[in-house]
Amino acid sequence: MIKTGIIGADTLPAAELLRILVNHPEVDITLLYAPELTGRQVSSVHHGFIGEDIINFSNMADPSALDVIFITDDSEYGRNLIDNRQKFPETRIIDLSPGRFQNWSSLDMEYGLSELNRKSLVRGAKYAIIPTEVASLSLIGFSPLAHYLLLGGDLTIEVAAPADLVDTIDTVALGDEIERQLRNLQTSFTGKVRIKIEPNKSQRVMRIRGLIGCNLSLEEISKIYENIYDDHNFTFMSYSPVEGREVEGTQKCIISYRKPDASTLEIEVIGDCRLRGGAGDAVHVLNLLFSLHEKTGLYLKPSRYGHTRESTSRSLSWFA
């Protein structure tokens, strides 16, 4: 079993993480670090845990006794763990703290997006930083085009996100994060990535959308995306936009594409932003670091679903 600790266990990202880890067959939750809540039960802070056999919150932590540590807050303790990680060389660290990209350039940590860096995460990586929510979906949508050297000029990405996230997103830093990863794939890409954000009606679902100049046919575009994602377990393609309930509560990410005209390609990506760029990506990285199957612990049931009659025809709202 993988002895697992969470720093900042009282945070909302930690709650999402716990809801996955409690059912992960290879994980032993050994530490829930939240000093101000020492001795309290998880169910007194996070809902959905009544009846679950989980340890209480604690203010005592021994990193060397853990196989992996998730950092979910910006506490001084979490930062010190990263700065002094050589003192416990056998412990892996996965950083999904809010301020994780402030000093990333000076850290030896893999960018924790499987769709980009699966090989490096599997082949000996010990430290990973989880992409932000918008970056996770945006890179899944546009990185195949960078792989095939199809990006040119500036890229504007429109984002429809849950209202509580809109004011927390630093669009400049986010643009820099996405640009850096795209340029790693296509060095000739010198454009700027600009982010436009507006709230949607969902509490969990995020959509991103962007237009690029592209003369390829839909069939050619489809082959590109299938070549890139054919052996990935959570990323799928669709010729038409999909409803939020297809992804809500799951690790799935669905890409749709269309040609508004012969020289333009529209890419749209939808995912659960509490999991993508958060707890779901973090557990996905955990599986890779420990050479587990990618889907271990991530067979998640959609949290919103229903029946759609075949005869029903309606356009999907960008804000759905």
Predicted stretch roles:
Residues 33, 114, 158, 196-198, ...:
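Residues in well-ordered beta-strands of folded domains
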Residues 167-237:
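C-terminal substrate-binding/catalytic lobe of Rossmann-fold NAD(P)-dependent dehydrogenases
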Residues 8, 12, 136-140, 173-180, ...:
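Conserved active-site and cofactor/substrate-binding residues in soluble primary-metabolism enzymes
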Residues 1-172, 187-191, 258-261, 295-296, ...:
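N-terminal Rossmann-like NAD(P) cofactor-binding subdomain of oxidoreductases
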Residues 16, 20, 140, 144, ...:
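Alpha-helical scaffold segments in soluble metabolic enzymes
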Residues 124-126, 204-208, 263-265:
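Short amphipathic alpha-helical segments
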Residues 11, 75, 132, 200-202, ...:
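Short, surface-exposed acidic/glycine-rich loop or hinge patches that mediate macromolecular interfaces
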Residues 209-320:
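C-terminal active-site/capping subdomain that shapes the small-molecule cofactor and substrate pocket
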